[in-house]
Regions:
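Formylglycine-dependent sulfatase
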Residues: 8, 12, 17-341
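Bacterial N-terminal signal peptides that target proteins for export
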Residues: 1-7
Length: 341
């Protein structure tokens, strides 16, 4: 909800502050990243992660160190962000709720920009993909190619936690094609301001990315996230049911592959960071560079064994904290960090 309000107010503010230099409303580059927790270099929350391009984006604007999602689940988080209505208002609480039945098209962020005269276009995962409403967009990349499979006989992960290095090129994954769409749009000269949404899938599972990204994180150097074996001892029954320690975490301990899973998540983040670098390069070369607001966000965080829990679907810090950066030319202070929730 706060993000929606910011987008609808910062645009006019930026226009007014820079009226002498600007000839029209500022553009918006709206970058969504799936399942990215706060393992970004500039926060220092994980010494192993490698996010030089996220750091580049943060260095140009303001990063929010205590940004939290509306719900630690893809569908309700994204529906809340795009509508400005919290799950308690919309009734969209899980991935099976069709938000389109309760959130009319003219309520959404895309509609606000279209009413303001913007070209509204996008690619990738902005809404949860079980439900989509393409009529909200002037243009959208619909066809995403199939990704390569791991080699025959290769382990696919542990239970539902899926990860495997791939022997393929960077451009064989869907996120490359999504990023290409954003690069093309940034390179065009548009006859009206644009709202360009780029939704990257990684580091959502499966953490199947080219092997070279796994090689950045040698297994013998992987450090597990902070955890206590008895961390759930003082948690009430409802919290234990939320953690499900007998599920993913029990399998991870039984197989001894916890470090491999952490390696896979770090590798998927590194692959995403590479695509962010490509997108940022295109923005810096764009004729609209100095008149484009950048809003980068992730839909929620992710547990990798903290409190014996994996995935999101929990109300602890690791699942609810998200990555969030703004660049507003003429307004944000480069390299600033806001620690207010």
């Amino acid at each position: 909800p706060r993000l929606l309000a910011c987008l609808l107010t910062l645009g006019p503010l930026a226009l007014n502050l820079g009226a002498a230099e600007q000839t029209r409303k500022p553009n918006v580059l709206f970058i969504a990243i799936d399942d990215l927790r706060d393992w970004v270099t500039y926060f220092g929350r994980n010494a192993q992660t490698r996010t030089p391009n996220l750091d580049r984006i943060a260095a140009r604007g303001v990063a929010f160190s205590r940004a939290y999602c509306a719900a630690p689940v893809c569908n309700p988080s994204r529906a809340a962000l795009m509508s400005g209505l919290r799950p308690a208002t919309s009734g969209v609480y899980d991935n099976n709720n069709d938000w389109r039945t309760v959130l009319p098209e003219d309520l959404m962020l895309t509609a606000a920009f279209r009413r303001a005269g913007y070209l509204v276009c996008g690619a990738g995962k902005i809404y949860h993909e079980s439900f989509s409403r393409r009529s909200e967009w002037d243009d959208y990349l619909d066809k995403e190619k199939k990704e390569p499979d791991p080699a025959p006989g290769q382990s696919l992960g542990v239970g539902g936690i899926r990860f495997a290095p791939l022997d393929c090129r960077d451009d064989e994954l869907v996120d490359w094609k999504i990023t290409d769409y954003g690069i093309r749009e940034l390179g065009k000269r548009h006859d009206r301001p644009f709202f360009l949404a780029v939704g990257l899938h990684k580091p959502h599972m499966p953490w199947n990315v080219p092997r070279k990204y796994y090689d950045l994180f040698p297994l013998d150097q992987i450090v597990l996230p902070p955890h206590l074996a008895n961390d759930l001892d003082d948690v009430p029954a409802a919290g234990r049911r939320m953690a499900k320690p007998e599920g993913d975490h029990a399998q991870m301990l039984a197989t001894g592959r916890w470090k491999e899973a952490v390696q896979g998540y770090l590798a998927a983040i590194a692959y995403t960071d590479m695509n962010l670098g490509r997108l940022l390069d295109a923005l810096e070369q764009s004729p609209e560079r100095d008149n484009t607001i950048v809003c980068l966000w992730s839909d929620h965080g992710w547990h990798l064994g903290e409190k014996s829990h994996w995935r999101k679907f929990a109300l602890w810090e690791e699942a609810t904290r998200s990555t969030h950066i703004w660049i507003v030319p003429g307004l944000t202070k480069p390299g600033a960090i806001c620690s207010q929730p």
